[in-house]
Amino acid sequence: GSPVFIAFRSSTKKSVQYDDVPEYEDRLSLSENYTLSISNARISDEKRFVCMLVTEDNVFEAPTIVKVFKQPSKPEIVSKAPFLETEQLKKLGDCISKDSYPDGNITWYRNGKVLQPLEGVVVLIFKKQMDPVTQLYTMTSSLEYKATKADIQMQFTCSVTYYGPSGQKTVQSEQAIFDIYYPTEQVTIQVLPSKTAIKEGDIITLKCLGNGNPPPEEFLFYLPGQPEGIRSSNTYTLTDVRRNATGDYKCSLIDKKSMIASTAITVHYLDLSLNPSGEVTKQIGDALPVSCTISASRNATVVWMKDNIRLRSSPSFSSLQYQDAGNYVCETALQEVEGLKKRESLTLIVEGKPQIKMTKKTDPSGLSKTIICHVEGFPKPAIQWTITGSGSVINQTEESPYINGRYYSTIINSPEENVTLTCTAENQLERTVNSLNVSAISIPEHDEADEISDENREQVNHRATLIVGIVLRLLHGALVAGVVYWLYVKKSKTASKHVNKDLGNLEENKKLEQNNHRTEA
């Protein structure tokens, strides 16, 4: 359009004259050195301004071009996709920068590297809009992107490049990281809890996992011997498992049954059968076979206990004795399986009728005699003494402890004449009576040996075994010496026979010679 005068200043007048130009109203200032300032710059101020110097003789002009710049806002990624899918071209988002003048350019970056358009993989759509009022530009760049698994945790950014008074500048956006969806490529199955050994009665949970993102929420579970899968979430629980649950367990994707995983489960078991068991009552001398049978998924250890004391071997009774009575426990366990133990008990009661043996001995002082009634039987027999004849009783019925069905009662007596002592032993099975004649204290008599107690029996047996061993060694030595001596004597006799034979031949020769001489004469 036509030039418009906007300001005038005379060298002779100090005042400034501004023309009536509405768009510059109250925005112009012309200084004494003829510098024109425009406040509150606008895009419309981008024009050609001319400074004119008018003199009496001539007119001088000095034109200049005014450029207006507006820095755009920091770019921002908006309309972001909630996730990206592999092998699918999908809109990632829009990068927008507002209020720019002049307009700028937008660039996308993946992990700091510029994204260049690539058909079917990277699609960029750029557009700009100018506000009709402010004449400022808004730039928008849309990015469509086909993601791969390599884009997991990758940083996407964008920048705007614009021109300012000092040249080209760039402003970066904040980074954006997108969740990458990808299909399951492998299925795995787990057994929970993750202990190594499973026993009967346990609760186990099968957990199926797919390595896709997001992971599958439903699977098909296949139990041993069942061709049809059971549809469930990613877990399937088995309660109170039994030994017949041992086998291969599988799971697969619902929509892709060929993608399957399997695991082998062994349910360990342990059975124990004790025969007989519970409380068993037998008679002394009876035979009692005892068996503890084990059935287990692995080799099991077996321990026998009697009255809380571990036995070296399994009990076997060909002829029951009172000391065989007690509480027997057969216990077994699988060492590799925690908590898998079984035990059965046998309470053995050995009963017997009372048996009595009586002995007597004279006190070294010669003033009293001790009579002992040895009793064995079970239940414990009660002992009762009776005396026939006269005599003074010094100390009556002192009893020993009842051990292994045996005990004894002693009575000390100083009879002035011959007496008979009777010992009666009685339990629920029978009443047994035995008597012993005891001479008067003044009459010496042969003492009978005491019954060997159970505590001393083992020591005596050990000593007897030792003595027998020594005697056998002595006999062996004597036998060897005898054999050597016999061989020596035999050899000596043989030599003697040879000498005698030779001597006899000499004598016979002499006689023959004498006879020959006589014949010749």
Curated annotation (Swiss-Prot):
<keyword id="KW-0966">Cell projection</keyword>
<comment type="function">
    <text>Cell adhesion molecule that mediates both heterotypic cell-cell contacts via its interaction with CD6, as well as homotypic cell-cell contacts. Promotes T-cell activation and proliferation via its interactions with CD6. Contributes to the formation and maturation of the immunological synapse via its interactions with CD6. Mediates homotypic interactions with cells that express ALCAM. Mediates attachment of dendritic cells onto endothelial cells via homotypic interaction. Inhibits endothelial cell migration and promotes endothelial tube formation via homotypic interactions.</text>
</comment>
<feature type="glycosylation site" description="N-linked (GlcNAc...) asparagine">
    <location>
        <position position="437"/>
    </location>
</feature>
<feature type="glycosylation site" description="N-linked (GlcNAc...) asparagine">
    <location>
        <position position="33"/>
    </location>
</feature>
<keyword id="KW-1003">Cell membrane</keyword>
<feature type="topological domain" description="Cytoplasmic">
    <location>
        <begin position="488"/>
        <end position="521"/>
    </location>
</feature>
<dbReference type="Pfam" id="PF13927">
    <property type="entry name" value="Ig_3"/>
</dbReference>
<dbReference type="GO" id="GO:0002250">
    <property type="term" value="P:adaptive immune response"/>
</dbReference>
<dbReference type="GO" id="GO:0005886">
    <property type="term" value="C:plasma membrane"/>
</dbReference>
<dbReference type="InterPro" id="IPR007110">
    <property type="entry name" value="Ig-like_dom"/>
</dbReference>
<keyword id="KW-1015">Disulfide bond</keyword>
<feature type="disulfide bond">
    <location>
        <begin position="95"/>
        <end position="158"/>
    </location>
</feature>
<feature type="glycosylation site" description="N-linked (GlcNAc...) asparagine">
    <location>
        <position position="105"/>
    </location>
</feature>
<feature type="topological domain" description="Extracellular">
    <location>
        <begin position="1"/>
        <end position="465"/>
    </location>
</feature>
<feature type="domain" description="Ig-like C2-type 3">
    <location>
        <begin position="354"/>
        <end position="439"/>
    </location>
</feature>
<feature type="disulfide bond">
    <location>
        <begin position="292"/>
        <end position="330"/>
    </location>
</feature>
<dbReference type="InterPro" id="IPR013162">
    <property type="entry name" value="CD80_C2-set"/>
</dbReference>
<protein>
    <recommendedName>
        <fullName>CD166 antigen</fullName>
    </recommendedName>
</protein>
<comment type="subunit">
    <text>Homodimer. Interacts (via extracellular domain) with CD6 (via extracellular domain). Homodimerization and interaction with CD6 involve the same region and cannot occur simultaneously. The affinity for CD6 is much higher than the affinity for self-association. Interacts (via glycosylated extracellular domain) with LGALS1 and LGALS3. Interaction with LGALS1 or LGALS3 inhibits interaction with CD6.</text>
</comment>
<keyword id="KW-0812">Transmembrane</keyword>
<feature type="transmembrane region" description="Helical">
    <location>
        <begin position="466"/>
        <end position="487"/>
    </location>
</feature>
<dbReference type="GO" id="GO:1990138">
    <property type="term" value="P:neuron projection extension"/>
</dbReference>
<dbReference type="Pfam" id="PF08205">
    <property type="entry name" value="C2-set_2"/>
</dbReference>
<feature type="disulfide bond">
    <location>
        <begin position="373"/>
        <end position="423"/>
    </location>
</feature>
<feature type="disulfide bond">
    <location>
        <begin position="208"/>
        <end position="251"/>
    </location>
</feature>
<feature type="glycosylation site" description="N-linked (GlcNAc...) asparagine">
    <location>
        <position position="395"/>
    </location>
</feature>
<dbReference type="GO" id="GO:0030424">
    <property type="term" value="C:axon"/>
</dbReference>
<keyword id="KW-0391">Immunity</keyword>
<keyword id="KW-0325">Glycoprotein</keyword>
<feature type="domain" description="Ig-like V-type 2">
    <location>
        <begin position="63"/>
        <end position="172"/>
    </location>
</feature>
<keyword id="KW-0393">Immunoglobulin domain</keyword>
<feature type="glycosylation site" description="N-linked (GlcNAc...) asparagine">
    <location>
        <position position="299"/>
    </location>
</feature>
<feature type="compositionally biased region" description="Basic and acidic residues">
    <location>
        <begin position="507"/>
        <end position="521"/>
    </location>
</feature>
<dbReference type="GO" id="GO:0007155">
    <property type="term" value="P:cell adhesion"/>
</dbReference>
<feature type="region of interest" description="Disordered">
    <location>
        <begin position="500"/>
        <end position="521"/>
    </location>
</feature>
<dbReference type="InterPro" id="IPR013783">
    <property type="entry name" value="Ig-like_fold"/>
</dbReference>
<keyword id="KW-0472">Membrane</keyword>
<keyword id="KW-1064">Adaptive immunity</keyword>
<dbReference type="GO" id="GO:0001772">
    <property type="term" value="C:immunological synapse"/>
</dbReference>
<dbReference type="GO" id="GO:0030425">
    <property type="term" value="C:dendrite"/>
</dbReference>
<keyword id="KW-0677">Repeat</keyword>
<feature type="domain" description="Ig-like C2-type 2">
    <location>
        <begin position="271"/>
        <end position="347"/>
    </location>
</feature>
